[in-house]
Regions:
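Terminal, low-structured helical/coil segments at or just beyond the last alpha-helical repeat
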Residues: 24-28, 192-225
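Canonical positions in the second alpha-helix
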Residues: 36, 69-70, 103-104, 137-138, ...
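Structural marker of alpha-solenoid helical repeat scaffolds
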Residues: 39-40, 73, 107-108, 141, ...
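Helix-start (N-cap) detector for alpha-helical repeat units in TPR-like alpha-solenoids
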Residues: 44-45, 78-79, 112-113, 146-147, ...
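Position-specific recognition of the canonical hydrophobic site in helix A of tetratricopeptide repeat
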Residues: 55, 82-89, 123, 150-157, ...
Length: 225
């Protein structure tokens, strides 16, 4: 099935309306940042601010240019390293993204966001052993992190490792019970495992959180088969 198709469909409808309203204010903020930089071209904080607006507008190349300029002046700037890695990943420049995450971890050992970003990048780039090693290490360091457990569960789900994925989604939900994404993901995994009653419980829980039953119809229909 299309990955999280129903959940994303719900999100897209609301996001499209919201994005249309946000574009002009974002453009205005970007224009202000660019005008300020014209008078203060050496201000790193202004370049980081402009790059953040570029990211929100999905202007990946413009954002990368700003981070390149920052890092040419301050090669160890952690904010620029992290977000340039993110932008490089968006541009499918995986090796460059990996180098930025590794550099960030060199100057800030154990940084949660950099470790997570690197593990997810390795998964996307089909470095599966490195990805699992990285996410396992992150969970060992941050056993209370729902995000880390959910990230590992997503990797396991993509590899059709449904039983460990169910375990990890459950661990994530112990920490944030009302997270709709995690609960819908666990319902999907439970359907694959033919745990219909458990999957139904997750779907009903989502309805209790306010998710439309119509939006979950595809999942409910699978339980009838």
């Amino acid at each position: 099935m299309n990955r999280m198709s129903v959940f994303l469909a719900i999100w897209v409808v609301s996001a499209e309306a919201g994005f249309a309203q946000k574009v002009n204010p974002l453009r205005d903020s970007l224009r202000v940042a660019a005008d300020s930089l014209a008078y203060h071209p050496d201000r790193i904080d202004l370049r980081l601010k402009k790059a953040s607006w570029n990211i929100q507008l999905e202007e990946w190349n413009y954002a990368k240019e700003e981070y390149d300029r920052v890092l040419s002046k301050d090669a160890d700037n952690p904010t620029a390293l992290y977000f340039r890695a993110y932008v490089n990943e968006k541009l499918s420049r995986y090796n460059f993204a990996r180098l930025d995450y590794q550099h960030l971890l060199y100057i800030v050992p154990g940084n949660f966001e950099a470790q997570l970003g690197l593990a997810l990048l390795n998964e996307k780039d089909k470095h599966f052993t490195e990805a699992f090693d990285g996410i396992n290490r992150l969970i060992a360091q941050h056993p209370d992190s729902a995000v880390a457990y959910a990230a590992r569960a997503n990797m396991e789900r993509e590899r059709k490792m449904y039983e460990p994925a169910e375990y990890d989604y459950t661990e994530a939900l112990k920490r944030v019970p009302n997270n709709q994404d995690y609960r819908l993901s666990r319902a999907y995994v439970r359907i694959q495992l033919r745990k219909k009653e458990a999957a139904l419980s997750d779907l009903d829980y989502l309805v209790g959180l306010g998710v439309s039953k119509v939006a979950l119809k595809e999942f409910y229909d699978k339980l009838k088969k």
